[in-house]
């Protein structure tokens, strides 16, 4: 790939960006310099980065992979945060629920778009593990967490980080976390990834790491007051929420503390690098899934005989006086008196004004059978959607069969 562009590479772009010379209405009389020896292609090639971005940010998503191979300069601009910002400002981005999983044979990923009347999963990735080097020395991607920054999904596991670009359809290995950990909280704040908690020792659980995708570098930014294992992450208005999980360490009264941790969340203000006052879900229970959507943190909790669904007002900006308030919402349409025992697990993802609850592990029919109940019809890979505007649940298309133990995220592309 050359560093600069030539006329052959972007002649198609000129046809869409320049006015039709045969259309008199599209022509505007402008001042012409005295020396016009350079042709139009040279003029396009000499555009500064900001003006060139204004042009290429308007192309259809399907054309973006072609733009990336024009030259190194264009590829660099396509990967810049400003390109994503321009497309967002122009209303050219769409949101999808993204699920990725690893099995012995390879990696599989699929996305679900809610904009169409009949939403169905589209398998967007199916590759061998060896082809991307996630086996052997790079460790395993099992039990990974996923976080998306625009169109790029970062699959973060104990020993490896894999980046999938939904625009380009490419996979790349990135720098792993400083402290190998599993079952940790993860979220994105201002274009950077934050992780906290997880198994791997007391020192590991206390360290909060920040990942800069531009520099491909991790660093420890603070220490957690509470060391959590099996926690969940979310982010709203510059705050990283570390939710649920169990207490780890050698402190006394561990059983009591674990129950308290399971229904509480710690709040880390990324800009000030300060911890805010911790909050707890009313009524206790054990948080089994959580996510952020439209300014709120949504939490699914498991109790002795039921599931409950809550939202926490996380809007701190704009003079909102309701910050910190909890509200109980309509529970998901699952069999009554279901108590999750760890064999069935859910992932919660905010997608625009909807909350997707995805069954990523286990079979509810088996759970009911073990409790002596005979209901059937809810097996595995269940996907439920909660409309935050209407306050109602509906069932979406189940996960594809090859997507098991998935890591889920909302992709903007």
From Swiss-Prot:
Keyword check for Repeat: yes
SMART domains (UniProt xref): FBOX (SM00256), Kelch (SM00612)
Kelch repeat windows: 96-141, 152-191, 192-238, 240-295, 367-413
Family matches, as CDD domains: F-box_AtAFR-like
Entry-linked InterPro entries: F-box-like_dom_sf, F-box_dom, Kelch-typ_b-propeller, Kelch_1
The entry's keywords: Kelch repeat, Repeat
Domain F-box: 41-90
PANTHER family recorded: KELCH MOTIF FAMILY PROTEIN, EXPRESSED, OS02G0202900 PROTEIN
Name of this protein: F-box/kelch-repeat protein At5g26960
Organism the protein comes from: Arabidopsis thaliana (Mouse-ear cress)
């Amino acid at each position: 790939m050359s560093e600069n562009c030539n006329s052959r590479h972007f002649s198609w772009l000129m046809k869409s960006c320049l006015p039709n010379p045969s259309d008199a209405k599209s022509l505007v009389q402008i001042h012409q310099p005295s020396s016009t020896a350079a042709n139009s292609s040279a003029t396009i090639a000499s555009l500064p980065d900001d003006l060139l971005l204004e042009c290429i940010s308007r192309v259809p998503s399907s054309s973006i992979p072609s733009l990336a191979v024009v030259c190194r300069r264009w590829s660099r601009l396509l990967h810049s945060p400003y390109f994503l910002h321009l497309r967002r400002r122009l209303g050219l981005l769409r949101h999808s629920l993204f699920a990725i999983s690893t099995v012995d044979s390879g990696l599989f990923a699929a996305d679900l778009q809610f904009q169409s009347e009949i939403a169905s999963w589209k398998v967007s990735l199916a590759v061998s593990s060896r082809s991307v080097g996630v086996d052997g020395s790079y460790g395993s991607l099992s039990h990974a967490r996923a976080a998306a920054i625009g169109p790029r999904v970062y699959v973060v596991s104990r020993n490896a980080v894999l980046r999938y670009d939904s625009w380009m359809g490419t996979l790349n290995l990135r720098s792993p976390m400083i402290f190998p950990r599993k079952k940790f909280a993860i979220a994105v704040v201002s274009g950077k990834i934050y992780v906290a908690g997880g198994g791997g020792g007391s020192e590991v659980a206390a360290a909060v790491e920040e990942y800069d995708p531009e520099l491909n570098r991790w660093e420890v930014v603070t220490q957690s007051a509470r060391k959590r294992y099996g926690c969940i992450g979310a982010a709203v208005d510059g705050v990283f929420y570390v939710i649920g999980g169990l207490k780890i360490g050698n402190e006394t009264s561990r059983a009591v503390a674990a129950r308290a941790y399971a229904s509480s969340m710690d709040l880390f203000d990324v800009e000030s690098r300060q911890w805010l006052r911790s909050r707890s879900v009313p009524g206790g229970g054990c948080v089994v899934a959580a996510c952020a959507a439209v300014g709120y943190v949504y939490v699914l909790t498991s109790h002795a005989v039921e599931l409950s669904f809550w939202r926490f007002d996380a809007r701190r900006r704009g003079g909102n006086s309701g910050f910190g308030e909890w509200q109980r919402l309509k529970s998901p349409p699952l069999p009554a008196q279901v108590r999750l025992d760890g064999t069935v697990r859910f992932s919660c993802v905010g997608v625009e004004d909807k909350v997707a609850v995805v069954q990523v592990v286990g079979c509810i029919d088996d759970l009911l059978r073990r409790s002596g109940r005979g209901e059937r019809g809810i097996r595995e890979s269940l996907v439920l959607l909660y409309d935050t505007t209407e306050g109602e649940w509906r069932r979406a298309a189940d996960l594809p069969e090859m997507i098991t133990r998935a890591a889920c995220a909302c992709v903007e592309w």
